[in-house]
Amino acid sequence: MKKLTSAIIISSLLSFNALAETLPNVTILGTGGTIAGSAAKSTDVTGYKAGEIAVTTLIEAVPQIVDVANVDGIQVANTSSSNINSEILLGMAKTANELLAKDTDGIVITHGTDTTEETAFFMDLVNQSDKPIVVVGAMRPATAISADGPMNLLNAVTLAASEEANGRGTMVILNDKIGAAYYISKTSSISMDTFKAYDQGFLGTFAGGAPKFYFEPAKVTGKPSFDVSKLETLPKVDIIYSYQDMGPEMIDALIESGSKGIVVAGSGNGSVPKAVRDKISELNESGYPVVLSSRTGSGFVTAKEHAIGSGDLNPQKARIMLMLALTETKDLNDIAGYFGTQS
């Protein structure tokens, strides 16, 4: 009987090892956010503290993950996504690229939803591999009765482990919907269905526990790629919100504080009051980069005589693009090329 039991155990271990060898390898980079949030009450979905739970604990809470991929976790940070900075982004990019250059088949980043689109867009521009990077979050903390994080995480790992995800760039997955990092944005402060790409739509959805893509892999038209492996810092770039009666004083203050470039969230197609336009024209003539985006949330901002148009990038993504562009050039026309809006 003992011999039979031992044989069964050995057989089970061999089967498990064989399965592990055939599964894809996925590394989860934990940064905190609501998905790792904790509240005093299970009914509290707003008064919680983000970035309280370790990434290893998040993985352990979803035992089905082991059927999808060989998973390990790295705690990059554990904070609210509003605290994610250039130092964290650069470190995460270097880690992801080093892993993807080896035997890691996909990367998952757990992240707070408030700035998910910025991190995802950054990773999309700096990924040096065709292997997928998937950014995932949650709208309810891990302690909530109906927390969305566990299913979102399982979907994210499944997506990162899928061969069909190769060549699609960085993606964002929440609420069963797969979005391209280049276009996806958070559109509601409370809705579970918060991420949208108004003009471009989604890449796919989850059905029956598997990703279903609407299109074959395709590259965003004109999307640049940046190698950040040797960078230790990123240029300081700030955003100003346009409004009636706005003056140029904030622009002057930002330049004095050390900003190397400015993105203006203008009204409509990047419109700003005359006093601000005159200031931007003056800066443009001096070679200082100002990018005009739109506060509308969607649409295209065309090339301007007095400034760089952001194309189809919203202000927060235009800031990421300008930061990375400035690591390669100071020429305004070359910078405009990264936005696809050369004059």
Regions found by a protein language model. Give the residues of each.
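ATP/NTP phosphate-donor binding region
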Residues: 21-97, 249, 278
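Short Gly/Thr/Asp-enriched flexible loops that form oxyanion-binding sites at enzyme active sites
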Residues: 110-131, 272-281
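Gram-negative bacterial Sec-dependent N-terminal signal peptides
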Residues: 1-20
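Short beta-strand segments
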Residues: 29-31, 109-111, 134-137, 171-175, ...
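C-terminal non-catalytic interaction/assembly regions of soluble proteins
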Residues: 269-343
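Internal gly/pro-rich beta-alpha loop/helix module
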Residues: 135-207
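Accessory alpha-helical/coil subdomains and C-terminal extensions
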Residues: 23, 29, 54-57, 61-65, ...
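Short acidic, glycine-rich surface-loop motifs adjacent to enzyme active sites
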Residues: 101-116, 257-269
